[in-house]
Amino acid sequence: MAVVRLHLTLIEMAGGRKELTIDAQQPVLLTTLLAQLGVPEEEVGIIVRNRKRDEIDCMIQDEDVVELFPILSGG
Protein backbone atom coordinates (compact mmCIF):
# COMPACT_ATOMS: atom_id res chain seq x y z
CA MET A 1 0.00 0.00 0.00
CA ALA A 2 1.12 3.55 -0.74
CA VAL A 3 0.21 6.58 1.36
CA VAL A 4 -0.62 9.94 -0.19
CA ARG A 5 -0.88 12.96 2.13
CA LEU A 6 -2.47 16.20 1.01
CA HIS A 7 -1.71 19.55 2.60
CA LEU A 8 -3.39 22.95 2.93
CA THR A 9 -5.75 23.87 0.06
CA LEU A 10 -5.31 20.49 -1.65
CA ILE A 11 -7.33 18.89 1.17
CA GLU A 12 -10.39 20.95 0.27
CA MET A 13 -9.96 20.22 -3.44
CA ALA A 14 -9.91 16.49 -2.67
CA GLY A 15 -13.21 16.62 -0.79
CA GLY A 16 -11.68 16.98 2.67
CA ARG A 17 -9.40 13.96 2.43
CA LYS A 18 -6.07 14.54 4.18
CA GLU A 19 -4.55 11.11 3.68
CA LEU A 20 -5.23 8.28 1.29
CA THR A 21 -4.00 4.74 1.27
CA ILE A 22 -3.95 3.23 -2.19
CA ASP A 23 -3.23 -0.22 -3.52
CA ALA A 24 -0.18 0.42 -5.68
CA GLN A 25 0.89 -3.11 -6.49
CA GLN A 26 0.74 -1.87 -10.06
CA PRO A 27 2.47 1.53 -10.34
CA VAL A 28 0.10 4.44 -10.93
CA LEU A 29 0.89 7.87 -12.33
CA LEU A 30 0.46 10.69 -9.85
CA THR A 31 -1.38 12.67 -12.52
CA THR A 32 -3.94 9.87 -12.83
CA LEU A 33 -4.50 9.84 -9.08
CA LEU A 34 -4.88 13.64 -8.99
CA ALA A 35 -7.52 13.46 -11.73
CA GLN A 36 -9.45 10.84 -9.75
CA LEU A 37 -9.33 13.08 -6.67
CA GLY A 38 -10.42 16.17 -8.58
CA VAL A 39 -7.20 18.04 -7.82
CA PRO A 40 -5.92 20.06 -10.81
CA GLU A 41 -2.27 19.32 -11.60
CA GLU A 42 -1.48 23.02 -11.80
CA GLU A 43 -2.46 23.45 -8.14
CA VAL A 44 0.28 21.08 -6.93
CA GLY A 45 3.51 22.95 -6.26
CA ILE A 46 5.69 20.56 -4.28
CA ILE A 47 5.79 16.77 -4.49
CA VAL A 48 7.83 14.76 -2.01
CA ARG A 49 8.02 11.01 -2.56
CA ASN A 50 9.88 8.95 0.02
CA ARG A 51 11.43 12.11 1.51
CA LYS A 52 12.83 13.35 -1.82
CA ARG A 53 11.50 15.96 -4.25
CA ASP A 54 9.79 14.48 -7.27
CA GLU A 55 7.89 15.57 -10.38
CA ILE A 56 4.19 15.65 -11.24
CA ASP A 57 4.62 12.74 -13.68
CA CYS A 58 6.13 10.38 -11.10
CA MET A 59 4.93 6.81 -10.67
CA ILE A 60 3.56 5.86 -7.26
CA GLN A 61 4.54 2.36 -6.23
CA ASP A 62 3.78 0.04 -3.35
CA GLU A 63 5.24 1.28 -0.03
CA ASP A 64 5.71 4.87 -1.30
CA VAL A 65 4.84 7.80 0.94
CA VAL A 66 3.88 10.86 -1.09
CA GLU A 67 3.34 14.37 0.31
CA LEU A 68 1.58 16.93 -1.87
CA PHE A 69 1.72 20.66 -1.18
CA PRO A 70 -0.04 23.43 -3.10
CA ILE A 71 1.68 26.27 -4.86
CA LEU A 72 2.73 28.76 -2.21
CA SER A 73 2.78 32.47 -2.80
CA GLY A 74 3.49 35.51 -0.78
CA GLY A 75 5.51 38.58 -0.71
Model regions: which residues?
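Ubiquitin-like/PB1-type beta-grasp interaction modules and other compact soluble beta-rich domains
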Residues: M1-G74
